[in-house]
Amino acid sequence: MSANKNPALALFLAHSSELESEAGDRYEELAEVMEAHRNLPVAEFFRRMAREAAQHLAEVAELAGDTPLPRLTAWEFDWPEAEPPETASYEAVHYRMSLRQALELALANERAAESYYHEFAADSSDEETRRIATGFADEESGHAAELERLLLTLPENGSSLREEDDEPHMPE
C-alpha cells in the first residue's frame, strides 16, 4: 500500500483510523460505566467491542505502514452524523440495559460503519481506495452477522427493564 502516493487512500485511512479509535474509546467508556453499576455482562460485551475496534485500528495502521496519515481537524471529517458512524450514542445507553439491548446497539453501529464504508467506496474515484473500503464494509457486515446470530440466543427484554427500583437520593 502506498498511501503517501495515494492521497485518496490516505484520506480514507485517516477517516477509518478516527472511526475505529472513537468507537473503541466509547465502548471502553461504556464498559466502565456498566461495571460501576454492576451490569457485568454488558460491561464485558462492551469491552469485547472495544477490543474489536482496537484490532481494526491496528489493521488501518498496518495498511498505512510508515506513511503518515493526514491530520484532520474535527470539522474536516466527513461523517454522516455529528460523530463517526460506529460510535455508540450516549442516549442509547442506560445503566440497566440488557445484554440484548447492548447487542442491538452494537449491531446498529456495525451496520452504520458498513454503510459508511460502502458509501466511501462508491464515492471514490480511486481503485485502491474502493477496494479497501469495500473490504472494510464486508468486514463490518461479517461482524453484524455474528451479532445477529448471538441475538437469536438471547431472551427478549422484560417490560420493566428500565424501571428504577431505588429511591432517589435527595438531600433532606
Tell what function each PLM region has:
Residues 1-172:
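Iron-associated oxidoreductase/ferritin-like identity signal
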